[in-house]
Amino acid sequence: KLQLGYGGDTLNTALYCARLGVEAHYVTALGEDARSQWLIDEWRGEGLGVSHVVRIPNRQPGLYWITTDAKGERSFSYWRGESAARQLLSAESTLTRLSVELVTYDLVYFSGITLSLFDQQGLERLWALLRALRGASVRIAFDGNYRPRAWASKELAQSVFAMALRHSDI
């Protein structure tokens, strides 16, 4: 049985915060296609703030497929190569906008999955954003969620995670 849904570590965290009555907003990039709009509408319906969702033409949401075996073990297949989220910080204007908008927040949360989406330029922009937010007393929480297939090597992931920890409070 095939079932359509949405999820992921950072999205699930934001959704559960919203369901608990905590004001939560999601920062990501989506395309301008119907599936992207459906996601925004669904998240908004869950009470999640979507004003920081960047829309990128000619891109679509990433996709993953979960298969569950007879013992209940899950395995994942990913199609994220052309996802809009990979381009979230590609424009300097988006970085500037997020630096201004997110300084009013108490906490910003990101994960190892987030890190795996960005190239070196995207990571440098993320570090700059996190430095700006910490400088404005926003607490930064890092979830070290690690998926080996998302990284070119274990050593690269370790290096990037070490940098993430240097930019985090929690």
Regions found by a protein language model. Give the residues of each.
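Residue-level marker of alpha-helix boundaries and capping positions
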Residues: 4, 29-30, 119-120
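Conserved beta-alpha-beta core of the PfkB/ribokinase-like small-molecule kinase fold
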Residues: 107-170
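Glycine/serine-rich anion-binding loops at beta->alpha junctions
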Residues: 8-13
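Short pre-catalytic strand/loop immediately N-terminal to key active-site residues, enriched for Gly-Thr
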Residues: 1-7
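Conserved N-terminal subdomain of the carbohydrate kinase-like
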Residues: 23-113
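Alpha-helix C-terminal capping segments
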Residues: 14-23
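Short, glycine/acidic-enriched loop or turn micro-motifs at the edges of active sites
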Residues: 1, 32, 146
